[in-house]
Amino acid sequence: EGKVRQAVFETCWEGRMEEIEPDIYIDGAHNPEGIEAFIRSARSICGKRPAVLLFSVVKDKNFEQMIGMLAASGVFTHYIIVQMQTKRHLAGESIEELFAKYTSAPLTEFDESFDGYLYGKKLQEEIPDSVLFCTGSLYLAGEIKQKLQNGR
């Protein structure tokens, strides 16, 4: 029983609140239920520390509700909007417009997901004790992880 508990404790589901670098997490939440769980986990991880969110989404999801939930959570101090390299992506400008509707926090947009990731890392280094979260799509998680594995 002890070995089973230890194995469960050490199990990591790739792309689900996965810490890919110190204080940098990727989560493939891509619907309102997933975003709700993501927000709970992000809040638990960062506590009162500042959090930066990198976000993208595909156009056939309930993206406006997801964006509203993220903005209303009060967890994130900065938002980075990126466009994924999939035909299903929602244009970055559209995502940015929706975030602007729900929050006055700083918004920065990138055409390339990994450029946004690098900017997020830079912000995380500049903002003391901050955490970077990347979410909105499993495609996004995959793009970032692939670039990291390939050494960009």
Protein language model regions, located:
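Acidic, glycine-rich flexible loop segments
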Residues: 134
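Nucleotide phosphate-binding/pyrophosphate-handling subdomain across enzymes
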Residues: 1-78
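Glycine-rich, phosphate-binding/catalytic loops in enzymes
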Residues: 42, 70-71, 98, 150-152
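C-terminal helical cap/extension that packs against the catalytic core
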Residues: 24, 67-131
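Short, active-site-adjacent cap segments at secondary-structure transitions
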Residues: 140-142
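Active-site-proximal loop/hinge segments that shape catalytic or ion-binding/gating pockets
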Residues: 137
